[in-house]
Regions:
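Flexible glycine/acidic-rich beta-alpha junction loops that bind and position SAM and/or redox cofactors
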Residues: 84-93, 141-143, 173-178, 202-207, ...
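N-terminal pre-triad scaffold of radical SAM enzymes
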Residues: 25-30, 291-318, 336, 343, ...
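Terminal amphipathic helices with adjacent charged low-complexity linkers/tails
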Residues: 61, 190-241, 255-256, 264-267, ...
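Conserved SAM/AdoMet-binding glycine-rich loop
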Residues: 24-26, 55, 59-60, 341-489, ...
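Acidic, low-complexity intrinsically disordered tails
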Residues: 373, 379, 595-652
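Conserved, mostly hydrophobic/aromatic
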Residues: 165, 275, 310, 335, ...
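N-terminal [4Fe-4S]-dependent radical SAM core
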Residues: 1-19, 29, 231-303
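Glycine-rich beta-alpha loop elements in corrinoid/cobalamin-binding modules
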Residues: 10, 37, 56-253, 260-261
Length: 652
């Protein structure tokens, strides 16, 4: 039946089901689109002959809300949805967000905090012995003990707190089908201890010995000692590749073990094609029409997923823990076939919004050996500089983009999911840069240097500042050749571990020199299972156990943010304080290099009058890629003649 999967018992009856094999409880609204993890998992199970009922966003205060289908034949599946529920709910300053793009009408409050734990306990109150498997981003990144930024404490494995039997972690296609088949065969869920890509709990120490499992520091140790936490985290980080990973276990109360089997094997291209070639309705369930639909679909409805996995190795990113470092791709035929489907949509205007993934311009593993031996342990492909074995080649991606541009009904194909500029520079052939600027930039290209300080970039795992500056030159030069006026928009981050006020001032000076003011400033967000979050919590870099300064005081973080928008009058007092504390009062004055003027008077109201900045700045964009590199500048400072009150009110 080509329709949405059942969301009510009546839907099941239409299909002739007495009870579904699985009931899938999710924190998002039900969107049947391959950009949504629950859609992929449910459709994949369906393709293997299993029936799945969906309970989207149940009322966690009412036990009846998860009894819609009764007890499933094989088990419950639980996911928070496409995002960690805490990231979904709170900004980095821990303020409640006003909207939830994954809920009907963008309404906030339709899922609980720590959704997987809450849903799991809700299920367990009614179905005490029914198998329960949790998965998705929230469960995957909390699979072992982890620092939780929102409660500011180390929490246990989510497997224990949720009451679940298994975690299907990472990209769960292989493990969820294997779990379903094991349950179908009659195997008890507590005996499913042998599958890659899963986490289970046991009291059987002999099982650990038979599987040659490697012990992590126990939970009490990592909770009590930040050094033990950093050591444990880095062992986990080094065991995220299917080919090289050990089985790991963590001890709780001396007799209970949470065991992480090695990650699932990356999907082959034909397997990726099958997953994305499954039948999807490609939109939200019609029950949400009255609320105005689900806003998140608008960002992905006319986008194409080309790849998964990333060998970029950014320390603030959890992709290594979730998708792994081995890039997996779909075939051209699969992607072109999906693009043709888009052209038949009634609201398709001819524009494909994105063709990419975690990193758009990664279309193959970084080197040949990864497919047989996995990624290197203890080494990165691009950081601190590209590995000599790196295969920097954009020819496949160029050919794919050309095929998409030539499809009937397609006017333009954009790239929005981000490119690695250091990988572009590593490719000796400039064809991709030319094609990118000529065909695939929608007025501005977003890139992510993140910072300009060498010390901070080292902690970020990002390339040195001169690499980004070289890309700016080449991008500008290419646009000049093409006669294009196109912007570069850099993503920048404040308060990342390693950034003191000194480095924040260095970034402000760079922004002054390139005449750029970010419209929005992103503070570092300590989310579970990243190296940067480990640094934030422990004050240690787990790679070498060196001490790392981290701004945790909200006022200092506010100063670092303000320095990135030093020309905003509202930020004057914070910028003044930051420059004073950093010993950089030389940047307070009337010279063109100064960030602000001296105080015009005492107090906040007088301080705001003193705003000035060197060279003026554009807001939100910089660097037109046209001849002359014309800058849009806002006239400010003493050159501007003040009108008298009489002039302001003068009648024409």
């Amino acid at each position: 039946m080509r329709d949405f999967l059942p969301v009510t018992r009546a839907d099941c009856e239409k299909r002739g089901w007495k009870q579904p094999d699985f009931v899938y409880v999710i924190g998002d609204a039900y969107v049947d689109h391959p950009s949504f993890g629950p859609a992929i998992i449910s459709r994949l199970l369906e393709s293997h002959g299993f029936s799945v009922g969906i309970i989207p966003q149940p009322d966690w205060r009412d036990e009846k809300s998860i009894q819609v289908f009764g007890e499933p034949r094989l088990g419950f599946l639980v996911s928070s949805g496409n995002m960690d529920s805490m990231v979904n709910h709170y900004s980095v300053s821990k303020k409640r967000r006003e909207t939830d793009l994954y809920s009907p009408g963008g309404e906030m409050g339709r899922r609980p905090d720590y959704a997987v734990v809450v849903y799991g306990n809700l299920i367990r109150r009614t179905y005490k012995h029914t198998p329960m498997i949790i998965g998705g981003i929230e469960a995957s990144l909390r699979r072992l003990s982890h620092y939780d930024y929102w409660s500011n404490k180390v929490r246990r494995s989510i497997l224990l707190d949720s009451g679940a039997d298994l975690i299907s972690y990472g990209m769960g296609e292989r493990s969820i089908v294997a779990i379903a088949q094991a349950l179908e065969s009659g195997l008890a869920v507590e005996d499913i201890t042998f599958l890659d890509g899963t986490v289970y709990k046991t009291r059987d120490r002999e099982l650990l010995e038979r599987n040659h499992a490697r012990a992590l520091p126990d939970f009490e140790s990592v909770r009590a000692s930040k050094q033990a936490y950093a050591e444990s985290f880095y062992i986990q980080y080094q065991n995220t590749d299917h080919f090289t990973a050990d089985t790991l276990y963590e001890t709780y109360d001396k007799k209970l073990f949470v065991v992480q089997n090695r990650p699932a094997k990356p999907l082959l291209q034909e397997e990726m094609d099958r997953v994305y070639g499954l039948f999807y309705m490609r939109t939200y369930h019609p029950m949400y029409e009255a609320a105005g639909g689900v806003p998140a679909i608008s960002e992905v409805k006319f986008s194409l997923i080309s790849n998964r996995g990333c060998f970029g190795g950014c320390n603030f990113c959890a992709l290594t823990f979730h998708q792994g470092r081995t890039v997996q791709t779909r075939s051209h035929a699969s992607i072109v076939a999906e693009a043709r489907l888009l052209t038949y949509e009634p609201d398709f205007k001819g524009y494909i919004h994105d063709v990419g993934g975690p990193t758009a311009n990664f279309r193959h593993p970084s080197c040949e050996k990864q497919l047989e031996k996995g990624v290197c342990t203890g080494r990165q492909c691009l950081f601190p500089s590209p590995c000599k074995n790196l295969r920097a080649d954009h020819r496949d991606y160029i050919a794919l983009l050309k095929k998409l541009r030539e499809l009937p009904g397609v006017k333009k194909v954009f790239i929005r999911s981000g490119i690695r500029f250091d990988y572009v520079l590593a490719d000796d052939d400039e064809t991709f840069l030319r094609e990118l600027c000529a065909h695939h930039v929608s007025g501005q290209l977003k890139v992510a240097p993140e910072h300009i300080s060498r010390a901070v970039l080292e902690r970020l795992g990002k390339p040195a500042p001169e690499v980004y500056k070289e890309f700016v030159k080449r991008y500008t030069r290419m646009n000049e050749r093409l006669g294009k006026e196109q912007y570069l928009v850099p993503y920048l981050m404040s308060s990342h571990p390693g950034a003191t006020l000194k480095e924040a001032v260095e970034l402000a000076e760079y922004l002054r020199d390139i005449h750029y003011t970010p419209k929005q400033v992103q503070d570092f967000y300590p989310t579970p299972s990243t190296i940067s979050t480990c640094m934030y919590y422990t004050g240690l870099d787990p790679r070498d156990m060196s001490a790392v300064y981290t701004a945790v005081n909200p006022h200092e973080k506010a100063m670092q943010r303000a320095l990135m928008q030093f020309n905003n009058p509202k930020n004057y007092d914070l910028v003044y304080e930051a420059l004073t504390k950093a010993g950089r009062t030389d940047l307070i004055g009337f010279d063109k290099k100064c960030l602000i003027r001296p105080r015009a008077g005492r107090g906040k109201s007088g301080g705001n009058k003193g705003i000035a900045f060197g060279g003026n700045a554009t807001s939100g964009t910089y660097l037109r890629g046209s001849a002359g590199q014309k800058m849009q500048r806002r006239e400010t400072g003493p050159k501007r003649k003040k009108k008298t009150i009489r002039n302001i009110h003068k009648k024409k």
